[in-house]
């Protein structure tokens, strides 16, 4: 069984093609991505209208490239991100997927973007055991309990305000590091002291929700620190600020992820989402998982960011689990809950 996946929830137009191996894994046949990040960089962040127009221009050429790389005329099934994401961006991918599914006369599966970030790990590390997944990106920060990729995912916790990746972008903009902020902050932090500034760790008190996150206070603390230095006529050390901010984010993310794994009784932690490409998040996760006796699974950075392969992979797992196709009348859902792996109608 060969499955094509289409991803258009934000600023990447991704088309991936996989072959289901029948053992809980997929073989990667094609992974084509067209990104509009350079267009958004001019505005300091993702502009929904710009993203939608970029998807319109890129979707068909990207699909054609993926088919050519895979060496096939059409897939056996087609999966698409139905949500969550930007409304206009989702609409482009869903419309294309419906049109091609009808033209090719292949089954159509409307699947969850967040579930794809978990599923894609199986391409690199094999069948997925029961696990806790930490998903971190510009729009999402979630702790998930995954028993089976073909079954509903349980959300253990999420951010109550800013996503971690969003905080990275805002702090990078404050420091004049440009967009996207994650890679820029990570690079700046390499020359800084992560213990230089004691930035706060949000929602880590004894009365706070064990598995939820908050990054707005941290973002504000960085802004106030910079303002205080400027008022005093002192020079800010951008590397120290970047390293200290990055440490505060990584500290909370990894501490709560390990805690969640212990709480639900699993021995595997999976990282996913574009922000998990951050070097400090990965390093601290490795350190804390080793101390806790947990197995850490982290896909290579290309598979952590948005791509069509993750959607094809989730579609393949759902099909193998006996899921019925979605109706072509299904509508995209920008606010789709992570507990809904597939939308049928």
Curated annotation (Swiss-Prot):
Keywords: Acyltransferase, Cytoplasm, Iron, Metal-binding, Transferase, tRNA processing. Its main location: cytoplasm. GO terms for molecular function: iron ion binding; N(6)-L-threonylcarbamoyladenine synthase activity. It is found in: Cytoplasm. Gene3D superfamilies: 3.30.420.40. Belongs to the KAE1 / TsaD family. This is tRNA N6-adenosine threonylcarbamoyltransferase. The gene is tsaD.
């Amino acid at each position: 069984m060969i499955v094509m996946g289409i991803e258009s929830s934000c600023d990447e137009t991704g088309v991936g093609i996989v072959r289901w191996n029948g053992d809980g894994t997929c073989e990667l046949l094609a992974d084509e991505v067209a990104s509009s990040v350079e267009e958004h960089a001019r505005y300091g962040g993702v502009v929904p209208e710009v993203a939608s127009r970029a998807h319109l221009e890129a979707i068909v050429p990207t699909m054609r490239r993926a088919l050519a790389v895979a060496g096939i005329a059409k897939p056996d099934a087609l999966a698409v991100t139905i949500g969550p994401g930007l409304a206009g961006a989702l609409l482009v991918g869903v419309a294309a997927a419906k049109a091609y599914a009808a033209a090719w006369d292949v089954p159509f599966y409307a699947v969850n973007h967040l579930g794809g970030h978990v599923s894609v790990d199986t391409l690199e590390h094999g069948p997925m055991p029961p696990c806790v997944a930490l998903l971190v990106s510009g729009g999402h920060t979630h702790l998930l309990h995954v028993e089976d990729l073909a079954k509903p995912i349980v959300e253990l916790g999420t951010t109550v305000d800013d996503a971690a990746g969003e905080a990275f972008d805002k702090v990078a903009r404050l420091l004049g590091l440009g967009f996207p902020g994650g890679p820029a902050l990570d690079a700046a932090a390499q020359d800084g002291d992560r213990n230089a500034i004691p930035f706060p760790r949000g929602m880590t008190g004894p009365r706070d929700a064990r598995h939820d996150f908050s990054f707005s206070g941290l973002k504000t603390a960085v802004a106030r620190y910079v303002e205080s230095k400027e008022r005093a006529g002192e020079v800010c050390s951008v590397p120290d600020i970047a390293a200290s901010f990055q440490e505060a984010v990584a500290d909370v993310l990894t501490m709560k992820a390990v805690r969640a794994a212990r709480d639900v009784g699993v021995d595997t932690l999976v990282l996913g989402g574009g922000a998990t490409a951050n070097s400090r998040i990965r390093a601290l996760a490795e350190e804390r998982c080793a101390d806790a006796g947990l197995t850490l699974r982290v896909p290579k950075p290309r598979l952590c960011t948005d791509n069509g392969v993750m959607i094809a992979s989730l579609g393949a797992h759902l099909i193998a689990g006996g899921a019925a196709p979605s109706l072509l009348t299904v509508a995209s859902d920008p606010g789709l809950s992570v507990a809904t792996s597939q939308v049928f109608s």
